[in-house]
Amino acid sequence: MQKKPWFIVGLVVCLSPLAGGCGGGSGAGGGMDATQIPPGPNGNPDGHCAVPSAGLAAVTASPTTVVGTGNAASCTASAVVAAIAGGGVVTFNCGPDPVTITVPEIQIFNDGGLGDGSVTIDGGGLITLSGGGANRILYQNTCDESLHFTSSRCDLQNTPHLVVQNIAFADGSTPGDATALGGGAIYVSGGTFNAFNIRVTNSTQSTSHGDWAGGAIYTVEQSQPVFVVNSTFDGNVASSGGALGSIGTSWSIYNSVFTNNATLTAGDGHAGGAIYNDGNSYTLSICGSDFEDNVAASLGSGSIFEVVDDLKGALVIDQSTFTGNSNTGSVQSSSHPSIYVEATDKAGNGGLTITATTFN
């Protein structure tokens, strides 16, 4: 019997008519591991928050490049690297069964895409890209000259537009260079980024430092809010923000799951077992999501740690659940021990709005 693509489950949840509202190093080498391990269903099956159009999956019916010719052996790491380097819409034809492809760090070029810097990677619910525990999986940086400068102010540009959807990432690890500050699986500095129906597991940002974060994903200076929709983050580890970390990024997280993510236990940082945010003038909006058994050490905040340096931000949580998140530090909200937010100049945990949400 053929295994069914898991992305169908997430799509049904997203488009449910019962939905409610919510605010808010490189190289082409590497081998292929054709293990038949299905990524599994993604997102929160109990999350029914309506997703704005900006957060919906990209249209991939007419791909720029298709990786593979219908069987697992044709889906090599070098083919994946070349397809993504070319930009545009990348899909996969690796046969009817789930396939894991172990890849080197894949670069997102600033001038890729169809003249607009767009890169969409759609795994069709059957593909896992793995770093093999040796390297990060995706790398986007508008200020990395090797990725081709496209403007005189690389820190302010809003391209490339990177979208990952219906795909899993596993066993990513930060490199020992200047980008080791975050993103065990995915690093995005500049441009824009969205994730729809993805799963990130067992990925690590392994260097201990106060602002270094994001075992799964790390973003820097995003000109538009990052949408994370119908996605699952499990077993990721970082200095702070076991799953997600960022500087200067607004997030819109819908119908997603964060489980068993953790911070490192020695050195600096260690805030936000699941999410760590820092920077100026941004908002973290969460709706229909589940946070369970995430752990933080040192500074604490078992699930979410947010500091907006200019005190012009907010943390908005709606229709979500927090269960079994823990920390060994003292920095946390008195009313919601797994959360800490300092987002406005109001006394206490200013900028925090929570509705229809349970804490256990």
Describe these PLM feature segments:
Residues 81, 85-86, 102-120, 128-165, ...:
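Extracellular beta-strand-rich solenoid/capping regions of secreted or surface-exposed proteins
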Residues 32-78:
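Right-handed parallel beta-helix/beta-solenoid
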Residues 65-70, 85-103, 118-125:
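Glycine-rich repeat segments that build the extracellular carbohydrate-interaction surface of secreted
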Residues 123-125, 160-173, 192-206, 223-239, ...:
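Right-handed parallel beta-helix
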Residues 131-135, 173-179, 204-213, 237-244, ...:
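Short glycine/acidic-rich loop motifs that flank beta-strands on beta-rich extracellular proteins
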Residues 15-39:
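Bacterial Sec-dependent N-terminal signal peptides
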Residues 1-9:
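Bacterial N-terminal signal peptides that target proteins for export
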Residues 11-13:
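Hydrophobic helical h-region of N-terminal Sec-dependent signal peptides
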